[in-house]
Curated annotation (Swiss-Prot):
Molecular-function annotations in GO: carbohydrate:proton symporter activity; protein tyrosine kinase activity
Key words of the record: Capsule biogenesis/degradation, Cell inner membrane, Cell membrane, Membrane, Polysaccharide transport, Sugar transport, Transmembrane, Transmembrane helix, Transport
Native source organism of the sequence: Escherichia coli O6:H1 (strain CFT073 / ATCC 700928 / UPEC)
Localization terms from the record: Cell inner membrane
GO cellular component: Gram-negative-bacterium-type cell wall; plasma membrane
Family statement: Belongs to the BexC/CtrB/KpsE family.
Protein name as catalogued: Capsule polysaccharide export inner-membrane protein KpsE
């Protein structure tokens, strides 16, 4: 057995030594250039399936930009809106996402459409392809690029038929519009929901302070302690003025009447009665007990201040809601189609002249490299 193996090795060495570098160089062009070019031409002639491309250009605008009649010098100078640029990049990521692929597969039966590739094994999509492979194949069939100078998003879609390439692009635009609308409306809804929540809190606080005010009025049987205290103070001042006048009249009587004169006694009694009334009215205004007008006025003022503060706060929240609605409507974003997708008339892929030129260039470079390498080896052997 060992003898047979040694014999086979010796035979192979003899055959290899019989092949000279000159023989390799003689057939190198056929191996490196002609054979690969023949394979490429056979693939292009027999196996390759033509693919058509539909193209559209879109921009993302805010509603106030569309309604504004003012001249935007930034756009004239080629500067894009930073907010629109950010939204365009968001949309680009969404178009290349599995979510967009799922929507397209549901509407266009994407997997089924690209599984019918004929003999084109290089561009065939297996019906049993994994989710990762399916997504990679999808990204190879769509190209989304953003131009930061014009702010436009260029969308190119491919299909094995002109009709599918067009339908592919139209569906991408429809889903993109839905995504932009949902994104902008969701932000507006969140802002409005927050404003409405704050308004509801302010309304509850206002209702609570009003209920506290009504309860205080009912429990103390008083409408406005401040007004009543003011009226009582005015009455006391009036009575004190009357008392001063009566005391002056009494002193005048004493100038010509005795102390026990009926007129003097009557005047003194009247002054005492008036003083008693003054003391009674003063006791209603100020006293250590908690049911007096001065303490009631302080408590009432505090409750009334709460009502006024909560009323102003509620008004502010109502104004905030209206401003939020206007601002949300102003900032709503729309997908503006600048160039609509068209039905392609000619296939775009494969680009046969380009492929042949590139393939020939690569083969020639490889041929030259190997030619040089063999020449170096030949020199060393010599």
């Amino acid at each position: 057995m060992l003898i047979k193996v040694k014999s086979a090795v010796s035979w192979m060495r003899a055959r290899l030594s019989a092949i000279s570098l000159a023989d390799i160089q003689k057939h190198l062009a056929k191996i490196i250039i002609l054979a690969p070019m023949a394979v490429l031409l056979i693939y292009l002639a027999i196996f390759s399936q033509p693919r058509y491309m539909s193209e559209s250009k879109v921009a993302i605008k805010r509603s106030d930009d569309l309604n504004s009649g003012s001249l935007n010098f930034g756009l004239l100078l080629g500067a894009s809106n930073p907010s629109s640029a950010e939204d365009a990049l968001y949309l680009k990521e969404y178009i290349n996402s599995p979510d967009m692929l799922a929507a397209l597969d549901k509407q266009l039966n994407f997997r089924e459409a690209f599984s019918h590739s004929g003999l084109d094994f290089l561009n065939h999509l297996s019906k049993d392809e994994t989710a990762e492979g399916f997504l990679k194949y999808y990204k190879d069939r769509i190209n989304v690029s953003y131009d930061d100078k014009t702010g436009l998003l260029n969308i190119q879609t491919q299909g094995f038929s002109p009709e599918f390439a067009l339908k592919f692009n139209q569906t991408v635009l429809k889903e993109s519009e839905r995504f932009i609308n949902e994104m902008s409306h969701r932000i507006a809804r969140d802002q409005l929901a927050f404003a409405e929540t704050e308004m509801e809190k302010a309304r509850q606080r206002l209702d609570a302070s009003k209920a506290e005010l009504l309860s205080y009025q009912d429990n103390n049987n008083v409408l406005d302690p401040q007004a009543q205290a003011q009226a009582a103070s005015t009455l006391v001042n009036t009575l004190m003025g009357q008392k001063i006048q009566m005391e002056a009249d009494l002193r005048n009587l004493l100038t010509y009447l005795r102390e026990d004169a009926p007129q003097v006694v009557s005047a003194r009694n009247a002054i005492q009665s008036l003083q008693a009334q003054i003391d009674e009215e003063k006791s209603k205004i100020t006293a250590p007990q908690g049911d007096k007008l001065n303490r009631m006025a302080v408590d009432f003022e505090e409750i009334k201040s709460k009502v006024e503060f909560n009323t102003e706060l509620y008004k502010l929240t109502l104004t905030s809601i209206e401003k939020t609605r206007v601002e949300a409507a102003r900032k709503l974003k729309v997908l503006s189609v600048i160039s609509s997708p068209q039905l392609p008339q000619e296939s775009s892929f494969p680009n046969i002249p380009y492929l042949i030129a590139c393939w020939l260039l690569v083969c020639c470079l490889l041929f030259g490299t190997l030619k040089l390498l063999l020449a170096v080896i030949e020199d060393h052997r010599d």
